[in-house]
């Protein structure tokens, strides 16, 4: 963050502030809009002068879901298709409780899992190795996040 107006001195940044912004790059059409899914500053790393009137502040930030993931541990048993279990972990109020859209490719076979004190993302990465697509019959699933939401799908889709 480059500050030539002295904003950081009149409104000090301490951490835990929410960021609302759009991210654009000249070589790519469109933008990533963080106005709907806020980011949170978790550390103000460095402050230094880049010129006589300008200060640079390095902000460490992350999404709300990422910070919730770090703070949440799952110690529970689940029964159902793996895609249904992923849905419960991402959207469940006792787990990540994410407001972001979730795009899931249905998996087949009812499974039982005991999650041993893992974060939601760790739990999903553990159980995805057992998922088999109901549509593609593919046994290779990936879990990832894009600006549009979370995706749990097979390589073949």
Predicted regions and their residues:
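Assembly/oligomerization scaffold segments
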Residues: 1-71
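Aromatic-residue hotspot detector
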Residues: 13, 77-78, 123, 152
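Short, intrinsically disordered, mixed-charge
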Residues: 13-15, 91, 95, 129, ...
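Short secondary-structure capping/junction motifs at helix and strand boundaries
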Residues: 29-35, 96-101, 135-141
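Glycine-rich, acidic and aromatic/proline-enriched surface loops and short helix-turn segments
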Residues: 54-55, 62-68, 79-102
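Short beta-strand-centered interaction patches in the first periplasmic/extracellular domains
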Residues: 56-58, 63-65, 103-157
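Second-shell loop/turn segments in exported
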Residues: 70-79, 109-115
